């Protein structure tokens, strides 16, 4: 799963799509640099989050209507086990795992933005996404799709809409902390620090 999940972020970057978790970093940078207002920041976050939710729900419906493979027909399937764990995890665990997750995702976006070689971009995206999936971290937009698919399948009582709201609330907040504070504000602060002049002096030696 971790080896294949990188295609999602690759499609977002190369197709020029909008991803909420990426906006937490880029829009924060724009606001701190006074390129956009706080109103622009909040409206961008809200519209992107809602747009990602609508897209994730539509994708989940199409996937289920298309049969959904074998993962939707049994309450004991791996998908339902994962959904149950995500929907019933303590808030602090979801929050912490979401911080770590979007830190990796935003690093992938940041590196891709600085690279000109498409192959290098794909490699950077792959390893960052592989790390967050393999570590079991929490990504709000990924969970929108995964948990909606679980709700549309033959799910146990532990998979429900209250659990969906619980997960998305804490995961979204954690994603915002790492994207806006650790990455956006962090790089903004680093760029304002004076840089040492490493160029050799052109003055003649005495």
Which ranges hold each PLM region?
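Alpha-helical transmembrane segments and their helix-helix packing motifs
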Residues: 1-206
């Amino acid at each position: 799963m971790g080896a294949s999940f990188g295609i999602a972020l690759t499609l977002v970057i190369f197709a020029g799509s909008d991803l909420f978790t990426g906006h937490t970093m880029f829009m924060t940078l724009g606001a701190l640099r006074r390129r956009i207002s706080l109103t622009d920041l909040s409206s961008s976050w809200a519209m992107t989050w809602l747009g990602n939710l609508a897209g994730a729900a539509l994708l989940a419906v199409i996937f289920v209507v298309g049969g959904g493979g074998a993962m939707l027909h049994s309450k004991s399937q791996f998908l339902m086990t994962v959904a149950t764990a995500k929907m019933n995890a303590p808030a602090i665990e979801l929050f912490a795992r979401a911080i770590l997750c979007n830190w990796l995702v935003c690093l992938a976006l940041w590196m891709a933005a600085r690279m000109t070689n498409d192959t290098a971009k794909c490699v950077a995206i792959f390893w960052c996404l592989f790390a967050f999936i393999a570590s079991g971290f929490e990504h709000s937009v990924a969970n929108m799709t995964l948990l909606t698919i679980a709700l549309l399948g033959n799910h146990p009582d532990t998979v429900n809409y209250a659990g969906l709201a619980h997960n998305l609330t804490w995961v979204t907040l954690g994603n915002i902390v790492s994207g806006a504070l650790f990455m956006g504000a962090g790089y903004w602060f680093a760029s304002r620090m004076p840089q040492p002049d490493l160029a050799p002096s052109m003055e003649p030696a005495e």
